[in-house]
Curated annotation (Swiss-Prot):
This is Vacuolar membrane protease. It comes from Yarrowia lipolytica (strain CLIB 122 / E 150) (Yeast). Pfam families: Peptidase_M28, PFF1_C, PFF1_TM. The lineage of its organism: Eukaryota, Fungi, Dikarya, Ascomycota, Saccharomycotina. It is found in: Vacuole membrane. Residues 63-383, 448-460, 510-520, 633-648, 695-989 are vacuolar. The record marks 324 as: Transition state stabilizer. Zn(2+) 2 binds at residues 193, 228, 325. Residues 1-25, 548-576 are annotated as: Disordered. One of its GO terms (cellular component) is vacuolar membrane. Its main location: membrane.
């Protein structure tokens, strides 16, 4: 039966109905209703698309929402305790370089001893070690991988380390370490970074003591100090004797300001599997890959612990990043629910770990994610790799085999339209839509680059809407002009090919880089390939005529839409005594077959396997792709504040995510009712206008800039140096009164960042200072820093002999200084000047036999070059190959103002093989040293003495106070260096 005879038969049936054939009318009415309701046409498809998109969009929003679940009545008592601790910890900024840092430490000690003195389980043993730990280490810059390798750090640590054990504890199993840092940055109150972690640890200790019996494993709590500037508290712990017995750790962190605490890194599957015990799981291994690939530049103590051989988890608050390290990271900006989310999950995971007999799978990275905040899914990366390899091998074979069977069937039947037709149209449509999507997103990028800091949804919706609309127009047009055998199936097959290639690349990346965030491609390929197999199988089990029948647009109004017949061949034909299953060769009924059998065959050809394909493809792929987009952009969308390259990367990611989410609907888009693309394009246009016309920042998503006041005692200058994105920074400075008197001098730092400096009033960092007769803007705090050269015995002056120089640094009310070096050829921080000539640094202490834990043969770190003389109290560090590029010094004793340093250098070390320079040989042998010391306190005013001898109160750092007071609500300030004030002085040795 050809197309025309079939049409004639159907029209004859309609005429019979009009003439009063009750039976025919009933059959036609039922068939039309079923086809209209369940067939592959615009009404049921549009309904399903709408319902699916709304429900899954809400699910993704709930999954990534910043709002944690509500607190239960059972959780309130412990949460209230933790909340009170958080309030006390975060009363003031408390960086390592501040007196408030000591206040927080004393509070932690007091709470630990208070908890230990209360009732607890029988046989509880609590050990507290608050002794000082000194380390002298040379490591790469934690936050800048491009920095020279010769960075030397002397650190005096005062961690509070607590070990909880019981009579049930099995020492052979190893301990579980809980770690958080109690220091903040100078510009922040440190609520989420990392007061919440400290409060959680205190609450976990309280909870553990309240149990009926003790833990199976010891629990060690490391309340560590100075994570913010080098992860040094964790470094100090790794030299503690208790570190040798740690089996696994949980590191608690914060890089946002509230919300939900996410598991974003895990060392391996063995420890990560214990996160399954979390009551409110929130996790994604995508972020782990972001750290590995360098997309996320910050670091946590997790890095130190894993490099030291420990296994564990990294859990942190992660958004909004714009408030991170600012005064908005305070108790008012977070919630009890946020703290409870970290607390409850930490208790659950800690209990699971302490009860474990062993931690297997140490060599297997973990792939993990939560679903809706209720279910935690985890697999070893090895399993994902094996499944991916099998899928890559089996998928194409199975799909290809079925494809060839369908093609042979169609060719043998002599059909004019085969499954080979129509492959080019979707390729053209996708290419055009990708270009259009890129154009729209890039237009938004150029039109208002930084609005993405405020919301990434506007460019994402604009790009996604563009992609869907362009494909709707083009694929609908192609379908109108020349319908093909099964456009839906052809697109599914093409997507299978593309996803197969992406999966192959992902497998290669997994094998070479242990990538844990690319499992999405495996899911997408399996889903799309399965839908393709269903479509091919449907063609095999139906008759050739009904499975390949093509209807043109002119027949859309006929009783039976033939084009829909081709798009939706049934998965399985209906069985009845009068309708046997068609043969593989597609034999059809004779011309004289009864009309009701013809109607039945047509109804069968309207099969509803499309709905199975839809429900298989759209919900899963949309949830996976949109969830991936939301997760990635949640973590990245505020990074454009840091550089232009970051902005470029974010908008490129938005374009890619728009396409990835959009392909979800690609096989079905040409059948949507017209109002859907109209709504889609309306959303895209609205989102574009909002993006272009709205201010880029708001009080909830402010522009973050950085401040430090630099005082050069040699030049007699005091400048406020502020760093931020170009144009934005200068706009903010227009609000600052001081810049009217002292115009900022701005220069580009490259990558869309500029630095401006202007004359700033002197800081008042020491109580009792006297004001200058010339006013606040005159005079420098010369009493803060002094550097005196101490004579040493002369050494040989041969071209490759060692030179020694000694000097003492006197820095009042100070805990940290940095030494940078320069010669005629070398300059610290400049990798192009070669290897540093400084080969040995000696630090003398005022207290002979200074306490501290030194490294031994059993240390996890091999501290090559560090030696200590217990009789003289000298620390020495030798670094002959790399040299010492710079030295960072820390000290805990506020009453001891001095650092006593001796340097040994070889001026010609780096000149080997180079011709001798002409000039003053004595000048070549000299070593220049710039001493820069930092001060970090600003909130409490200082008491000073004016010209008449009267006491007055002054802001400690007037320039920073002015910025905080006068900057617009859509901007906020963070520290640029270790402190808020840096005072420098230069000497030559």
């Amino acid at each position: 039966m050809d197309r025309q005879s079939l049409r004639t038969t159907l029209r004859a049936m309609d005429a019979s109905n009009e003439n009063g054939s009750a039976k025919g009318a009933k059959k036609t009415t039922i068939g039309s209703f079923v086809r209209w309701t369940f067939g592959f046409n615009s009404v049921p498809l549009t309904t399903l698309v709408t319902i699916t998109t709304v429900l899954l969009g809400l699910l993704v929003y709930v999954s990534t929402s910043v709002n944690p679940p509500d607190v239960t009545e059972a959780q309130k008592p412990l949460l209230n305790y933790a909340w009170a601790q958080l309030g006390e910890i975060s009363r003031y900024p408390h960086p390592y370089f501040s007196h408030d840092n000591d206040r927080v430490r004393q509070h932690i000690l007091k709470e630990v001893y208070t908890l230990a003195g209360r009732e607890h389980f029988e046989g509880a043993q609590i050990e507290v070690d608050d002794s000082q730990t000194d380390i002298f280490i040379q490591k790469e810059d934690v936050f800048d991988k491009s920095a020279p390798p010769g960075k030397l750090t002397y650190f005096e640590g005062n961690n509070v380390v607590v070990r909880l054990s019981s009579k049930n504890s099995d020492k052979s199993l190893g301990a579980i370490l809980l770690s958080a840092h109690f220091d903040s940055v100078p510009s922040s109150f440190g609520v989420t970074d990392d007061g919440a972690g400290i409060a959680t640890m205190l609450a976990v200790l309280k909870h553990a003591l309240a149990q009926n019996e003790g833990p199976k494993r010891d629990i060690i709590f490391n309340f560590n100090n100075n994570e913010e500037f080098g992860l040094l508290g964790a470094e100090a712990f790794m030299h503690h004797p208790w570190a040798q017995n740690v089996s696994a750790f949980i590191n608690l962190e914060g890089t946002g300001a509230g919300g939900k605490a996410i598991l974003f890194r895990a060392s391996d599957y063995g420890v990560a599997s214990h996160y399954s015990a979390a009551e409110m799981p929130f996790a994604s291994s995508v972020y782990q890959e972001g750290f590995s690939n360098g997309f996320i530049h910050s670091q946590t103590d997790y890095k130190v612990y894993t490099e030291g051989g420990l296994r564990g988890l990294d859990i942190a608050f992660y958004k909004p990043r714009a408030l991170y390290h600012t005064r908005r990271d305070n108790i008012a900006e977070t919630t009890k629910n946020a703290l409870n989310h970290m607390l409850v999950n930490t208790i659950d995971v800690t209990q699971s770990m302490t009860e474990a007999d062993s931690f297997d799978h140490a060599d297997q990275p973990a792939v993990f994610s939560d679903i809706g905040g209720y279910l935690f899914i985890i697999l070893p990366l090895q399993y994902i790799f094996v499944i991916s390899c099998l899928t890559l091998a089996v998928g194409p074979i199975f799909v290809g085999f079925l494809f060839l069977l369908v093609l042979r069937k169609q060719i043998n039947a002599g059909t004019s339209e085969t499954i080979l037709g129509g492959w080019l149209r979707s390729i053209v449509s996708v290419l055009v839509s990708v270009v259009a999507t890129y154009f729209v997103v890039e237009t938004l990028h150029l039109g208002n680059e930084l609005y993405v800091v405020r919301s990434f949804y506007t460019p994402l919706f604009a790009g996604l809407g563009t992609f869907i609309f362009v494909n709707y127009v083009l694929l609908g047009f192609f379908h109108f002009v020349r319908p093909v055998c099964d456009q839906k199936l052809i697109i599914l097959l093409e997507l299978s090919v593309v996803l197969w290639v992406l999966l192959l690349l992902s497998v290669i990346h997994e094998a070479t880089h242990k990538a844990t965030g690319e499992y999405h491609f495996l899911i997408l390929y399996i889903v799309v390939a399965t839908a393709s197999i269903l479509g091919l199988f449907g063609h095999l089990v139906t008759s050739t005529e009904t499975s390949t029948f093509v209807e043109g647009p002119e027949d859309e109004e006929d009783t039976v839409d033939a084009s829909e017949a081709t798009e939706t061949s049934p998965l399985l034909p209906e069985a009845s005594p009068d309708n046997a299953a068609p043969s593989i060769h597609g034999a059809v009924d004779p011309e004289n077959q009864q009309e009701d059998k013809t109607l039945q065959k047509i109804a069968v050809s309207m099969g509803y396997d499309w709905s199975i394909q839809f429900l298989l493809v759209v919900p899963i792929t949309f949830f996976v792709t949109f969830g991936l987009a939301a997760s990635l952009l949640d973590g990245l969308h505020q990074t454009p504040l840091e550089s232009e390259k970051s902005a470029d990367f974010v908008y490129t990611t938005i374009t890619a995510m728009s396409v990835l989410v959009g392909i979800t609907f690609l096989p079905f888009v040409h059948k949507l009712q017209v109002f859907v693309p109209i709504v889609v394009v309306g959303v895209a246009v609205t989102a574009s206008f909002v993006h272009i016309l709205s201010p880029p920042f708001s009080s909830n998503a402010p522009a973050k800039m950085r401040f430090v006041q630099n005082i050069n005692l040699d030049e007699g200058t005091s400048y406020a140096n502020v760093l931020g994105r170009q144009d934005v920074l200068q706009e903010v400075l227009e609000y600052i009164p001081s810049t009217d008197t002292f115009k900022p001098n701005c220069s580009s730092r490259g990558d869309g960042v500029e630095i401006c400096n202007y004359i700033a009033p002197r800081p008042w960092l020491i109580d009792g200072e006297k004001v200058s007769s010339d006013g606040d803007f005159a005079g420098l705090p010369t009493n803060l820093l002094d550097v005196k050269v101490v004579p040493v015995n002369e050494t040989s002056s041969g071209p490759f002999d060692r030179f020694d120089g000694r000097f003492k640094i006197s820095a009042l009310n100070n805990r940290g200084c940095v030494l940078r070096f320069n010669t005629t050829r070398f300059k610290s921080g400049d990798v192009e000047t070669g290897v540093s000539p400084v080969k040995m640094v000696t630090l003398r202490h005022n207290r002979v036999g200074k306490t501290g834990i030194t490294t031994g043969s059993g240390s996890r770190f091999s501290m090559f070059g560090w030696t200590r003389d217990p009789k003289t109290g000298k620390d020495e560090f030798r670094s002959f190959m790399h040299g010492v590029d710079d030295v960072t010094l820390h000290k805990l004793d506020w009453e001891d103002p001095e650092y006593d340093i001796q340097l040994s250098w070889i001026p010609r070390w780096y000149e080997v093989g180079d011709p001798e320079d002409e000039g003053n040989e004595a000048l070549k042998n000299r070593l220049g040293v710039t001493v820069t010391c930092s001060w970090a306190e600003y909130l409490d005013p200082s008491s000073i003495v004016d010209e008449q001898g009267r006491r007055r109160t002054m802001d400690k750092i007037p320039a920073f106070t002015e910025l905080n007071n006068f900057s617009p609500a859509w901007s906020i300030w963070s520290n640029q260096g270790r402190g808020l004030v840096e005072v420098s002085k230069y000497v030559e040795l």
